[in-house]
Amino acid sequence: MRGVWKSKVAIPFLASLVLESGAFSYSKANEAMQAHDAAGATRMHTTPGTPIYFQKLFQWMRLRLFGACLAATVILGIGAPTGWGQQAQEKSRDLELSRAVRPWEFLPVTGTRAVLLGNESGRMEAWVYPLKILREFHLKFRSEGRVLPAEALARTITVRPESSTILYAADTFTVRETFFVPVREQGALIILDVETEQPLEIEAAFHRDFQLEWPAALGATYLDWAAAQHAFYFGEEQKKFSALVGSPTAAEPRAEFQTNYSESQESSFRLGPTAKGKERKLIVIAGSMEGPAAAEKTYRHLTADYADLLKESTEYYRNFLAQTVTLDLPDEQIQRAYDWSRVSMLQGMVTNPFLGTGLVAGYRTSGVSQRPGFAWFFGRDSFWTSLALNAEGDFANSRAALEFISKFQREDGKIPHEISQGANFVDWFKGYPYPYASADATPLYIIAVNDYVVESGDAAFAKEKWQSLQKAYAFLKSTYDERGLPQNFGFGHGWVEGGPLLPVKTEFYQSGLGAEALRALSNLARVTGQEEISKTLEKDFEKQRSLVNASFWIADKKRFAFALDKNDKKLDEPSVLATVPMWFGLPSEAEAVPMIQQLADIDHETDWGMRIISNRSPLFSGGGYHYGSVWPLFTGWASVAEYRYHQTFPAYANLRANALLALDGSLGHVTEVLSGDYYQPLSTSSPHQIWSAAMVVSPILRGMLGLEVDAIHRSVKLAPHLPADWDRFSIENVRVGKNTLLFNYVKRDEGIVLETGLTSGSDECTVEFRPAISLKAKVQKVDLNGKPVPFQVETREGDQHIVVQFPVKTGKYILRIWLLNEFGYSNQPALPQLGSASRGLRVLSETWSASRDQLTLEVSGAAGSKYELEVWNAGLIQKVEGGELGRKPGWTTLWIHMPPSDSEPYPHARVVIHLWPKVPPG
């Protein structure tokens, strides 16, 4: 259970608590903080048993005291200094992840033009796009008359955005093998740092696998030793494709062979002996699509300049993280998962020398085939990922991904489903069934372009793509049936590509995307100055929205059908796919909330994410790719939808499940698909899936923090639904047109403080702050820089939102919201042990009494289990039915005991919390 950080430096709500006198200016506070930094005096106190996750605590404490002093100077009329909010330039997050080796886990090291794919035992394959060079690369250690396979000695794996290192340890030596792929080079390096007591020699071995990515092929290829380069040369008869694999110290080559009597696919070379002490060895892999001379040039460049290239790659990722939306969160696991997921998405950007630059879908080893997971270009993967890229402010890569896919739009307007990296070598678009297999890529294209334009403010892109967008809309309309619903049958699959859920005429998922595409196109027409077209499309959208909801809603069961069959009959198979229309807010709250509550139960939601259908369905199989498995993609859809409809407990559980997946499995990455029965990736899963990483970023930014930017209108909305035990966060580098903003949020017993201001730019923009509070809470007043400001309170079934709008230009803005009787509870779900079934708590619904003195929770959990919730403002609790209060340092806890049951392994229960009108004195 994660502890909640409590600063030794109190963050007061009122300025009078900050200052002993008005003379304590910002500059003195800053000097004090710098002295404090130098002394290294701050230490963190955690509750017993709490993991030490808060490695960045001091930076936050420095920021918070700085903010408190700044708030005081504003309130007291003291001039604030320039240069406020430059924390992003000062930070360099340490993203290194390390653990004991799991030999079976996937290990990717990526660049934009090359990639190494393997596992934590050190076995690798190498690609220089679109060319596969080798597989089964591994090391052998020769020491004291023995030959030791490296995988038997692999002890620790350490990953960083730019490289990964395996530590091998034996009795008398260690070797650190660092895999590194420069960002923009057609090659890779393996750096070996040796430390030994006895003479040691390393042998590098591999299987040549010199072929193009599927479905293309090179035909006859060969291997030879190039003595001048100390490397094996890979070639083919036309001498267009070539590669070199070697080392400056390579010697004693042994090449693959085949005779009538024996054969070996393995080639190897030795790196020269290390007598004793420390030494560095280097292995270089270079490829080219332009002949042997180009490959040799790259080989020499990598050999001579690898140290500079490693530094450049480190800076590349550091700069990317510093220039996109940066968070500082109280939960270090979610913090790291967010940053690593941003890196993972960036690692999906690939440059193919024949096709261009776009987003691939994911990575896995290809083995003896030429299919490296999904390391080629997909339409809908790119579009779902672009929504996360836009949210984090990575507009350049979002635009590049959209540009790439749109280049291959079919003449009738249909958007491609997938484009192999070998597509230019074959008749891909006419000779194969895959390029335009899906129907959902087309509406997603329109939606993704609109999202990019709104978030980035790039109206010129909308004008440039208008003809393409019109063609896409024309194709979408051509798929409508007589009622006006877009069809899958005969036009391309929706989400489900195969299995027992098919055939269907149209999915709710597909029809929802079709409706949202109309709204998106209406806005794009408005942005491009076509008001009449925009108004017509807006009316069409409202009609389509009503039609879609009515066509799939099953009123007596309070849920949406998965699909319609060929006779327009509703197929009552409740599915997480329904959360896609909810992501965009298409259903009403009266329709969405009851279905979300059904999806939150254990038959749909596992501890590691959302199943596609209930495990109680006769169609379910835990290993069914499209009929029972858990996809982080689904989990992200559900989380964003649940936050949109204020169902924060399942929303956070799903967000956290995806975040924790990023720190398990292939370190720093989120897998494609997992079993629906047990916490275990499917055996065919792509372990580094790009849109899975996107479904960490979108639920955090779009969901939990409610961050929405409209750069066209220079406005930003922040509508956080925070776990009750979160008392602060910071958001930096929020780009709104030419401006960037910073937000610092602090919650205390007295209320909420939001600090904001421009960190670059000078254009006025509008901030709308909409924090969620409980229905128990009462808003006393709101002020901005010490002056009262108008506000509204929007009340819903499950929470309230305080709504405050204010302009931001120059200067700093301190918004304070005074609250009474705020109340909340939280839970920190964890992943189970590998191979285990779900056992976590589910909060299915919350119901408040009209007088706000009673909160009823409907929950489900494993029979006989005990669950812990942490309570905010526990002094309000009068008594609890169905649970009991407890204490731990700094927190009151609510324990829920699920009843034992022989018949129902996951029973439901009810917890009723009775509350005082206000906290009793004493």
What annotation goes with each model-predicted range?
Residues 84-98, 158, 173-176, 180-373, ...:
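Acidic/polar, glycine-enriched structural segments that form the non-catalytic walls/loops
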Residues 196, 275, 279, 306, ...:
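Aromatic-rich carbohydrate-recognition surfaces in CAZymes
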Residues 16, 67-79:
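Bacterial N-terminal signal peptides
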Residues 289-291, 328-376, 400-437, 442, ...:
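Extended glycan-interaction surfaces of carbohydrate-active proteins
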Residues 87-135, 374-378, 385, 430-455, ...:
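C-terminal capping/lid segments that line or modulate ligand- or cofactor-binding pockets
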Residues 25-29, 85:
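Boundary at the C-terminal end of the N-terminal hydrophobic targeting segment
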Residues 327-336, 352-353, 390-402, 452-470, ...:
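Structural helix-adjacent loops and short alpha-helical linkers that scaffold large soluble proteins
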Residues 130-136, 140-185, 602-604, 637, ...:
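Non-catalytic C-terminal accessory modules of carbohydrate-active enzymes
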